[in-house]
């Protein structure tokens, strides 16, 4: 009996250690090499296949300096205004999310920073529970410890979902505007950023009033967004 209990404890611990060792190795690799595809992309494409959707993956990696400053500022203004200065976690946002989750009785809000969103996109699935949030936090801490802010942002910009099968700034810019991501205007960058929280909903509701309102909010805020200090774009 004791041996069974021992194995029941050791097995999940071993899996946890192995997974995090795998993740850390990939984080080191991604400091210099672009991901072939992310865990979130794979999950999403499998979901589309199960739903009977004929969707092809459109994912085009481009370097940081070939993405418009307008899009960078718009995303920071909307998704993580303190990105340049924090260590991966916005503690005020996390506290607010905990309060909202406690009031709702389930995990709905995450208070996620750009770094946390990237951790999820690269390695995790879309489930919402405290165990997954804990793993997300561990991955975020590892990533922030060994990866500079520009590289984190570059990985994020290239892995965001924007439409059915459309991932990354370059694919999104060419899908919506038939131009490279380097040439996005402020209005176009704000519109793309407004799609980020719910890209598939807006794919099905492109004339949503909520989308127009969010675009205008991003436009007003993006001028004051602070990019990472080493940004030379």
From Swiss-Prot:
InterPro entries: Glyco_trans_51, Lysozyme-like_dom_sf, PBP_transglycosylase, Pep_trsgly. Pfam families: Transgly. Pathway: Cell wall biogenesis; peptidoglycan biosynthesis. One of its GO terms (cellular component) is plasma membrane. The keyword Nucleotide-binding does not apply. Keywords: Cell inner membrane, Cell membrane, Cell shape, Cell wall biogenesis/degradation, Glycosyltransferase, Membrane, Peptidoglycan synthesis, Transferase, Transmembrane, Transmembrane helix. Its EC number is 2.4.99.28. It catalyses: [GlcNAc-(1->4)-Mur2Ac(oyl-L-Ala-gamma-D-Glu-L-Lys-D-Ala-D-Ala)](n)-di-trans,octa-cis-undecaprenyl diphosphate + beta-D-GlcNAc-(1->4)-Mur2Ac(oyl-L-Ala-gamma-D-Glu-L-Lys-D-Ala-D-Ala)-di-trans,octa-cis-undecaprenyl diphosphate = [GlcNAc-(1->4)-Mur2Ac(oyl-L-Ala-gamma-D-Glu-L-Lys-D-Ala-D-Ala)](n+1)-di-trans,octa-cis-undecaprenyl diphosphate + di-trans,octa-cis-undecaprenyl diphosphate + H(+). It comes from the Bacteria. The keyword Cell inner membrane applies. The chain crosses the membrane at residues 8-28. It is found in: Cell inner membrane. It is a single-pass membrane protein. One of its GO terms (molecular function) is peptidoglycan glycosyltransferase activity. One of its GO terms (biological process) is regulation of cell shape. Peptidoglycan polymerase that catalyzes glycan chain elongation from lipid-linked precursors. Belongs to the glycosyltransferase 51 family. PANTHER family: BIOSYNTHETIC PEPTIDOGLYCAN TRANSGLYCOSYLASE, MONOFUNCTIONAL BIOSYNTHETIC PEPTIDOGLYCAN TRANSGLYCOSYLASE. This is Biosynthetic peptidoglycan transglycosylase. It comes from Neisseria gonorrhoeae (strain NCCP11945). The lineage of its organism: Bacteria, Pseudomonadati, Pseudomonadota, Betaproteobacteria, Neisseriales. The gene is mtgA.
